[in-house]
Regions:
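A conserved acidic beta->alpha catalytic loop
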Residues: 30, 37, 45-54, 72
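Glycine-rich, basic loop-to-helix element that forms the pyrophosphate-binding segment
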Residues: 71-87, 97
Length: 333
């Protein structure tokens, strides 16, 4: 399908950028090369200390659709919120500045919305290892796009189980009417988990398309590889808030939320224990003990995590030894 500025609604593409001088060009090349051209591309430079600021300004001079905002470093959530505040598009899209997208990425998401008439469309992603990704993303023009309308419950179940629709903000196209719930918590990690369930709920239905044409870069030092306890603790708080938001009698996925909360609690305990943080370890040991009965009864919690909860109540010293042994063995593989 061919899109023109006259027949297609404006889409705001929000790109937060912090110290991404080695990735930003590839990201923006993939965005300005979209087949869907009626875009406002909002670059939010979040206090970068490398060449990111200069690159943002250079790209603004290259393409009139690009606008740049420079702000002091406040984190990913604040940068996204800044982009949301100044956006004028009928739809919003988030792309991380170290990732890339296929040339038809936005076209596919728009098509899913047009066919289904819903407020939110989504696709999955393809992982790219740093230093091994192609110069240009693989084109998807030769395949037939499969579009499926998912209920709120189906989308939540998918996200909670690592399915095709996740809690991440990128890889999606949001109707601007969802802005009221599309506010990221500032100063927190796992910010997408903290709000996306509310966005799903507000949207009611989600149009999923299977192009998988968001290219997610796995790089050393990224949050996905970090074991810092405060990051994992934010995940625990996010799933706790999600659990409190819903009633166990009114949704089919409640025990799956609980399983994710219990897993995040165990991960946080392990992180504090390995760091030698006695206060943090004690705090989460008490939470493990308090949740042992809940963990034992939860059918969605992995057996290994059930064992963590059981040992926390009966033999925390043995638990710590086993966790350290597991980490040491894992680091050798």
């Amino acid at each position: 399908m061919h899109f023109t500025k006259e027949t297609s609604p404006l889409i705001s593409v929000i790109v937060p950028a912090y110290n991404v001088e080695q990735y930003l060009d590839k990201c923006l090349e993939s965005i300005v090369g979209q087949t869907y051209t009626n875009l406002e591309i909002i670059l939010v430079n979040d206090g970068s200390t490398d060449e990111t600021k200069r690159l943002c300004e250079a790209w603004k001079d290259k393409d009139e659709r690009i606008q740049v905002v420079h702000q002091c470093n406040q984190g990913l959530s604040a940068a996204r919120n800044t982009g949301i505040d100044i956006s004028k598009g009928k739809y919003l899209c988030f792309i991380d500045s170290d990732d890339m997208v296929d040339s038809r990425f936005i076209e596919h998401l728009v098509e899913a919305l047009r066919i289904t008439g819903v407020l939110l469309s989504a696709t999955s992603y393809t992982e790219i290892l740093e230093g091994k990704y192609p110069a240009t993303p693989q084109e998807t023009k030769d395949r037939t796009l499969q579009i499926r309308e998912m209920s709120f419950e189906e989308a939540m179940t998918s996200a909670l189980n690592g399915g095709c629709v996740g809690f991440y903000a990128w890889g999606k196209l949001f109707d601007a009417s969802l802005k009221s719930v599309l506010r990221f918590p500032e100063g927190k990690k796992f910010e997408d988990q903290a709000i996306m369930y509310k966005v799903f709920e507000q949207a009611g239905k989600i149009a999923y398309e299977d192009a998988n044409d968001y290219y997610y870069l796995i790089r050393s030092g990224s949050l996905s590889h970090s074991q810092h306890s405060v990051n994992i603790e934010d995940s625990y708080y996010a799933f706790s808030a999600m659990e409190n938001h819903f009633s166990p009698d009114e949704c089919s996925f409640y025990t799956q939320i609980t399983a994710r909360k219990l897993a995040a609690c165990a991960d946080t305990y392990c992180s504090y224990m390995l760091q030698g943080d006695k206060s943090g370890r004690q705090k989460y040991l008490m939470l493990l003990k308090a949740g042992s009965k809940e963990a034992r009864a939860n059918k969605h919690l992995r057996p290994a995590l059930k064992l963590v909860y059981a040992l926390a109540s009966t033999s925390p010293i043995l638990l710590d030894r086993l966790l350290k042994l597991y980490v040491n063995l894992s680091s050798r593989t």
